[in-house]
Amino acid sequence: MKKIYGQAYVNISRKNITLNLERVLKSKAAKKYFTPKRWVRKKYIVDNSLHSFLNAELSKQYPNLGNSLKIYYINQKCFNDDLKKEEELYGKAKDMLSHEAIILQRGLKDGTATHESLHCLGIPHSFSERNVLFFEIAFKRNYTDNIMDYSDMYGIPTIATWEFQWYAIQRFIHALHTGKW
């Protein structure tokens, strides 16, 4: 994460916090988010309710983290209830311009946390229509080394950001730190 943000001349400080959910997971309200094997149910990631649940639990234990990006690392697989099998989901930002992202087991050892945190800051996929709207440019999917592409799945490491992304990253980080977001 530091390498990618460093390209934009942004120094990030990370604070790792362990959110103990063992007691909470025994409640009926929490059980819906997980299978009996404790796999995360995809539908609750997609509809953002798991993000909201984790935020509520985090706020109970750490009430002063409002203006922070929160990356929830969950070392579990993702389960698709409709297909009754594992979903190959690495992670998901709650929304563009949000404060939270969830990173699942598949995304723990690659650039998923950085990719999703950049979505939280409003940085779209390099190949998307949103990228055209935001930056007036888009690139062919899976052909760049940009962290916001998916080319790492095809042998091209996603190790770079581009100068036009740097300014957006800097603006959003500044807004986050000054409480203007």
Regions found by a protein language model. Give the residues of each.
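Low-complexity, acidic Ser/Thr/Pro-rich "mucin-like" tracts of secreted and single-pass surface proteins
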Residues: N20-E22
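Extracellular (secreted or membrane-anchored) zinc-dependent metallopeptidases
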Residues: K3-S13, T18, S27-E116, C120-W181
